[in-house]
Amino acid sequence: MVIPELFSAGLILLLLFITGFVGMKMKIPDVVIFILLGIAVGGLLSGSHLLHFAGEVGIVLLFFMLGMEFPLKQLMSIAKKVLRAGILDVALSFGVTMAICMMMGLDVITSLIIGGVAYATSSSITAKMLESSKRMANPESEFMLGLLIFEDLVAPILVAVLVGLTAGMALTAGSMSLLVVKVVALVAGAVILGVFLFRKLGSFFDRHMKHDLFILFVIGLALMYGGLALYLDLSEVLGAFLAGIMLAEVKRTHELELMVVRFRDLLLPLFFLYFGTTISFSEGIPMIPLLILVLVWSVIAKVIVGVLGGRWYGLTKKVSLRAGLSLTQRGEFSIIIASLAAGSIKAFSSVFILASAMIGILLFQFAPSIANKFYGKKAKTSVKQHVGSA
């Protein structure tokens, strides 16, 4: 007797709830829990097109909502404040990691993928831990969130480049130029629509946002622009993020987020679950020496970015160290990039993500006490505040 898909869908959602609830009680991020669940049930769900599509919609809505947080003027302001730290982050976390992989004998595309996996700190894990540990009011939180936003701007473009390269595009000057043209065209389209169309539709949104039909317009826009990015052989993540930036120009972010958030919360766990089902350890954990090397470097790189970037931002040495130790966990963007890989590289990336998430959680929790051991318990909140009070 064939099990109805409706029953299977309900069972999957209940399993996600149970494992997520257990993870919450154990203070393990739900991202990690859902991936582990996917690995455990991979034999039953592998190759499910419906699960893949539902998860894809979930990740599109995640980055659509992220884009809605940042009107163009705010994006430019944040980018300027953390620009030096952001560039250092790209150079160390992405560039040096890629160089390490190439020195260990990997090809350029594989090295790019692993560098991409090691690049971005998990926004969701970091934000949740800042809130749960009551450190959101600490002086380092503004710098950390600014750096995360910078990564959120860079990472979709990085994903778009990697999507193009893993789709079979040769790494030549011509192919890279074409890729840049596509990205610029997609970004320009979003900026033009945002500034010249959506910025003028505030009254239209006010009149119609409360109608049940309006959610079709909002989510339809996110899916369509994400789909346009896929049509251009770019990433749906970039398209969704840009669609969010478009709607941010309406200046009705809070109301629009309330419309979308429940759909995101329903579908996003399915993305992490599906990713887990695609991971296979049938041949064991590949390239263990390289894995350890990349894992150690990924922690060191983020600490350096936090220490130097925090000082450039105006934080004290102690607060900067606390920030650096709180940035080492990888998550959603690393998973998106890892999903572009195949076979042993996907398994390698998956172990790295899970290990870095767990190490990052521990370092985040012990960051204040470690910083106290280095610099003592009393420290001024920031260089700027100290100068101002003097």
Curated annotation (Swiss-Prot):
The chain crosses the membrane at residues 2-22, 31-51, 52-72, 94-114, 143-163, 178-198, 212-232, 266-286, 288-308, 351-371. AmhT alone exhibits antiport activity, but interaction with AmhM confers different properties, such as higher KM for potassium. GO terms for cellular component: plasma membrane. It is a multi-pass membrane protein. Interacts with AmhM. Ammonium/proton antiporter that mediates the efflux of ammonium ions. Can also transport potassium or rubidium, but not sodium or lithium. This is Ammonium/H(+) antiporter subunit AmhT. It comes from Alkalihalophilus pseudofirmus (strain ATCC BAA-2126 / JCM 17055 / OF4) (Bacillus pseudofirmus). The gene is amhT.
